[in-house]
Amino acid sequence: MKVAIVGAGLIGHTIAHMLRETGDYEVVAFDRDQHALDKLAAQGIPTQRVDSADAAALRAAVQGFDALVNALPYYLAVNVASAAKGAGVHYFDLTEDVRATSAIREIAESADHAFMPQCGLAPGFIGIAAHELANRFTEIRDVKMRVGALPEFPTNALKYNLTWSVDGLINEYCQPCEAIRDSRTQWVQPLEGLEHFSLDGTEYEAFNTSGGLGTLCETLAGRVESLDYKSVRYPGHRNLMQFLLEDLRLATDRDTLKNIMRRSVPSTAQDVVLVFITVSGMRDGQLVQEVFTRKIFARTVCSVPMSAIQITTAGAMCAVLDLFREKKLPQSGFVRQEQVSLRDFLANRFGQLYEGQSLDAVATV
């Protein structure tokens, strides 16, 4: 399968490396940043410089590929999806942006190839797992989806380090959040709904953030009383972000906030990804609660040290692409994450990264 990876940043680099290591994919990376491309070229991965904001140039560049994987920031998603449609290639992305996903859904109408956005951790894997749990109940009361990408060793006041896109992080803190309450789909405010819980002896907080549940509200509408998604952080983080975004009004000056965070909040590869899902409802005439949890830590994959967010985000994208290649997913139109079987995902060679396995055994290149 010939795959164009558009975006050679951290996650795009990881996706390209993982796919190449299987020996089943012919991968070419595209970006406008020559320095980022040079890093991939040094690993023997073919690259091509192209301006991803130029839809015509991108469309011409990806002609003849089977699939396009978009690993660029959310605000470029619609442009790249349009290029994929023009080139007649299948489209996959990682976007958490609700408006971008809605636009991509319109692009996918009447398309004879597949458009599958939101293929990362959240949205992505979290929706696959939550949908599987929900389907085990005859009557669903509550679905609670909690995900955190956290530093393993928090040391600053925010108790946070940068582990993924600053643009995506700020966007999910600022945009309205979809939820179901009292069996009705509605929009709730980001940073609200603060709650606290503990897992394995560690205290956490969680609060509303945008985009993490993908299309699950629509899929479960009419079947569930309450459904929501919240980001997990260490206690105290939400209050400080609320001060920055609301009291200092940086929600309306995102460029300044991005500069502050990039200058002052260090990145880390020593991170942990927490997935925590609870579903309650009726089964066999009894009120039952079922919990799904995973903790994924940074480790070496394909002989390369990788952070937990690299493993989970790139691993999810590669697993979904692999299942699509095996024709276990629809081959045309708009494809939702919850159309992926959790069993198939976790049995997949890339999905097994969520179970602590490695790809080293299948590397052939």
Locations of regions flagged by a protein language model:
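Conserved N-terminal Rossmann-fold NAD(P)-binding element of oxidoreductases
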Residues: V3-G7
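N-terminal Rossmann-fold NAD(P) dinucleotide-binding loop
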Residues: G12-H13
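Helix N-cap at the beta1-alpha1 junction of Rossmann-like dinucleotide-binding domains, i.e.
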Residues: D33-A36, V98
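Conserved Rossmann-fold cofactor-binding substructure of NAD(P)-dependent oxidoreductases
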Residues: D51-G64
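N-terminal Rossmann-like NAD(P) cofactor-binding module of classical short-chain dehydrogenase/reductase
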Residues: V62, D66-N70, Y91-D93
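Beta-loop-alpha module in the N-terminal Rossmann-like domain of NAD(P)-dependent dehydrogenases
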Residues: A67-A84, D97-T101
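Rossmann-fold NAD(P)-binding glycine/threonine-rich loop
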Residues: L94-P117
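C-terminal catalytic/substrate-binding lobe primarily of soluble NAD(P)-dependent oxidoreductases
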Residues: R136-V365
